[in-house]
């Protein structure tokens, strides 16, 4: 009987030692049901695209990966993330926005972009053709009319500054309606305050996507153990994005590290028209972009 009791005790102790609360949490909260820390210790990124979006216009991807830096360092990196100039990324300028902005707030960076870059030149041409059906800029009718009416570079610059200032003020005042669609893709995370992020860092960016320019505005904020990033205005490729990273502290080789479960989602009317192979190809492009961002964030945090 005593031998049996010792065996039972040994089994319980062994189970306790082997139990990993972070691994259990990942298995319970994410689609990575067979997860173990060993799967990501060497830098691999786990990917899952199933069961996220209930909206045809939303493309969403989940990833799980390790960053060999403390949770505090990773949180700071994500909240203050500046992708401009990072290898493999398309962002050429990232600027933090004050609580109050005007059309003039954007001109120092926007002017050289529109007149001196390939992507900016594409934006300028699309702006002049904004009332034409061929225009690919994702703007409302009023914004298109404002751009199409411009006759000089200075007028175009001011028009874009006006659009950005109004979009920013609108989000700060009312929130972005597009975020409600994107929430379907992150419903597994839990309740999130997205209409008016508390303590958020607002920013705007200029990007050059192989000669196709993009102008965007967004906000990054911390929500407990999660870091959220949402673009509420994007001119090209998609209309809004919403990303959430959940962070767990772990120890790897005796050093502090961070396990990240990340959901990336983007909204575009174009996604609804994609079927079969086209939809798969679209998802592959999104995944490629996400992996490049993950690698850049990892390199920054691990420095």
Question: Residue locations for each model-derived region?
Answer:
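Eukaryotic helix-grip
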Residues: 20-303
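Bacterial N-terminal signal peptides
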Residues: 5-15
């Amino acid at each position: 009987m005593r031998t049996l009791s010792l065996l039972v005790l040994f089994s319980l102790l062994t189970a306790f030692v082997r139990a990993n609360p972070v691994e259990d949490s990942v298995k319970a909260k994410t689609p990575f049901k067979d997860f173990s820390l060993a799967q990501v210790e060497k830098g691999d990124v786990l990917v899952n695209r199933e069961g996220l979006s209930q909206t045809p216009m939303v493309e969403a991807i989940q990833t799980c990966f390790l960053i060999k830096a403390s949770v505090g360092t990773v949180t700071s990196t994500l909240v203050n993330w500046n992708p401009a100039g990072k290898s493999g990324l398309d962002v050429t300028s990232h600027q933090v926005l004050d609580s109050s902005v005007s059309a003039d707030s954007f001109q120092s960076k926007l002017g050289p972009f529109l007149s001196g870059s390939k992507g900016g030149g594409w934006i300028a041409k699309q702006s002049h053709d904004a009332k034409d059906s061929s225009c690919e800029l994702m703007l409302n009718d009023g914004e298109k009319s404002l751009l199409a009416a411009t006759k000089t570079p200075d007028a175009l610059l001011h028009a874009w500054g006006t659009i950005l200032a109004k979009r920013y003020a609108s989000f700060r005042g009312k929130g972005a309606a597009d975020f409600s669609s994107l929430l379907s893709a992150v419903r597994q995370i839990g309740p999130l305050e997205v209409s008016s992020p508390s303590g958020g860092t607002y920013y705007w960016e200029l990007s050059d996507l192989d000669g196709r320019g993009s102008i965007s505005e967004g906000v990054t904020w911390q929500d407990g153990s999660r870091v959220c990033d949402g673009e509420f205005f994007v001119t090209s490729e998609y209309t809004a994005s919403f990303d959430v990273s959940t962070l767990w502290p772990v120890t790897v080789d005796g050093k502090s590290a961070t396990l990240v479960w990340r959901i990336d989602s983007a909204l575009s009317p174009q996604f609804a028209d994609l079927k079969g192979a086209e939809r798969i190809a679209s998802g592959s492009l999104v995944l490629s972009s996400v992996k490049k961002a993950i690698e850049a964030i990892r390199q920054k945090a691990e420095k």
